[in-house]
């Protein structure tokens, strides 16, 4: 279907050694432990603003819409009540992934979100878990394609089409009833469950390439191959300093940012392409990849964790980025290391699952914030929005806004 040739960009161990967790220009400001919670009845985490295929965050008839991974809170469930008779919110929070559902929220102000409910009714999605993706407004009729990940059994990139209906009182997402599976990991470019039982394959983010006008999608994957068989060679090492040639068990970390191209703009048929960026020997997770197109450059962002780094390299939970002049690369790690926005060392788990929007605003959710002593407070709610400035290959943290502030860049009036 396509005749596309390119070599993946390698995020090397030498690049990762440049990560500086104490650089104030790439550190997310501290989140206060007295943060507000947007709901007492549900946890939210990965947040997906409604957008168009060029990345523009949109409102519809004046209503902003976000989709979130959502799970009920269980304060009265006996399995989450500790020996002291109190609600064990930590365990409830840690169990959320197995019951993740796509839910939506709406707002007139780009904050103060009102809960709308499930996007898909129970039983519509073919798997037990609904994991992250991207909601795309297709036209001024209100049609929406929700790209997402069907997980357990297996993991597949899928989409479901529905529509948005608005009134003076609120928003309804309707008719999301038929899920179309698009593709799964192929074993040639992307690791399968058979090759590695803890494989990663998820988080579709479709976009129109501003240069060729075609519909593509980035997603999280792992480089294909049986677990433990990958080689951390000279290219994966990069120009490391003396004493850093030993890689330990780094061959087990094989994250990558994947790419696929659609047959046409309907997005119903896709061809899997080689990864754009590989992190063999550096990191095992490159979650929720997405683009910002600015100043003739392709800014490719992803999120990752400290605990998924390979032996001998480390970095904070947060946003990592790569920049290039062409979709197919080559890319350069932003700020020389790849780190764009990391949690502060004093609060290493305060936020995660950042989404960088074309206006420079970055949304994320609150995970856990230290309170006193060894105690901490679980979030499961929107974090303060921050703004970053992109200048060439560099980025700078600029401002902090309200919790969950996700303003529309454009309002679409339905015909």
From Swiss-Prot:
Pfam families: Glyco_hydro_68 (PF02435). Sucrose binds at residues 45-46, 132, 202-203. Its EC number is 2.4.1.10. GO terms for cellular component: periplasmic space. Disruption phenotype: Disruption mutant does not exhibit a levan-deficient phenotype. The lscA-lscB and lscA-lscC double mutants also do not exhibit a levan-deficient phenotype. Insertion of an antibiotic resistance cassette in the recombinant lscA gene abolishes levan synthesis when expressed in E.coli. Belongs to the glycosyl hydrolase 68 family. Strain PG4180 contains three levansucrase-encoding genes: lscA, lscB and lscC. Of the three copies, only lscB and lscC have been shown to be expressed while no expression was observed for lscA under the tested growth conditions. This is Levansucrase LscA. The lineage of its organism: Bacteria, Pseudomonadati, Pseudomonadota, Gammaproteobacteria, Pseudomonadales.
């Amino acid at each position: 279907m396509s005749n596309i040739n390119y070599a993946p960009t390698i995020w090397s161990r030498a690049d990762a050694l440049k990560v500086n967790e104490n650089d104030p220009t790439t550190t997310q400001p501290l989140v206060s432990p007295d943060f507000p919670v947007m709901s007492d009845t549900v946890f939210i985490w990965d947040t997906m603003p409604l957008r168009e295929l060029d990345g523009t965050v949109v409102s519809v008839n004046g209503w902003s819409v976000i989709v979130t991974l959502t799970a009920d809170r269980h304060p009265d469930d006996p399995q989450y009540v500790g020996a002291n008779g109190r609600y064990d919110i930590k365990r409830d929070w840690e169990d959320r992934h197995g019951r993740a559902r796509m839910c939506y929220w709406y707002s007139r102000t780009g904050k103060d979100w009102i809960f709308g409910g499930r996007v898909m009714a129970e039983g519509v999605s073919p798997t037990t878990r609904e994991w992250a993706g991207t909601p795309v407004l297709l036209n001024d009729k209100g049609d929406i394609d929700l790209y997402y990940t069907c997980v357990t059994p297996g993991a597949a990139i899928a989409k479901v089409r529905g529509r948005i209906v608005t009134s003076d009182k609120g928003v309804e997402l309707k008719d999301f009833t038929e899920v179309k599976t698009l593709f799964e990991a192929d074993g040639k470019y992307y690791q399968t469950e058979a090759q590695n039982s803890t494989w990663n394959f998820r988080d579709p983010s479709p976009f129109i390439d501003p240069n060729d006008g075609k519909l593509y999608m980035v997603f999280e994957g792992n480089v294909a191959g049986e677990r433990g068989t990958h080689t951390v060679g000279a290219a994966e090492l990069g120009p490391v300093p003396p004493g850093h040639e030993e890689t330990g068990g780094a061959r087990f970390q094989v994250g990558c940012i994947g790419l696929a191209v659609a047959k046409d703009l309907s997005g119903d048929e896709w061809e899997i392409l080689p990864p754009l960026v590989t992190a063999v020997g550096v990191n095992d997770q490159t979650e929720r990849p997405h683009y910002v197109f600015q100043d003739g450059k392709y800014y490719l962002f992803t999120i990752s964790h400290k605990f998924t780094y390979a032996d001998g390299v480390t970095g904070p939970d947060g946003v990592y980025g790569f920049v290039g002049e062409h979709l197919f690369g080559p890319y350069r790690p932003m700020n020389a290391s790849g780190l764009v926005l990391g949690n502060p060392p004093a609060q290493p788990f305060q936020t995660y699952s950042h989404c960088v929007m074309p206006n420079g605003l970055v949304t994320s959710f609150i995970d856990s914030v230290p309170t006193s002593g060894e105690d901490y407070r679980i979030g499961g709610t929107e974090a303060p929005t921050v703004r970053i400035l992109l200048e060439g290959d560099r980025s700078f943290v600029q401002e902090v806004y309200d919790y969950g502030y996700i303003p529309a860049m454009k309002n679409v009036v339905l015909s």
